[in-house]
Amino acid sequence: MEWIKCSERMPESGITVLGYCVCNSNFSGIYTMRKPVIEAKNSKQDTRLIKHERVTHWMPLPEPPSE
């Protein structure tokens, strides 16, 4: 799977995807997110709302492990 630029295409509403966010020069992260309100969960398991304009790329979730 490859990252998709938000400027090129957005995910369908209600679909959970991975999103890449660059919040400032000291932080970037990968989140699971849903449109239209992006509820993001980072690796520390906290939840926050991320503005759409901060998310630069997204991709569909990978298939779960088979075992």
From Swiss-Prot:
The source's superkingdom equals: Viruses
What is this protein's record name? Uncharacterized 7.8 kDa protein in ral-gp17 intergenic region
Look up and give the organism this protein is from: Salmonella phage P22 (Bacteriophage P22)
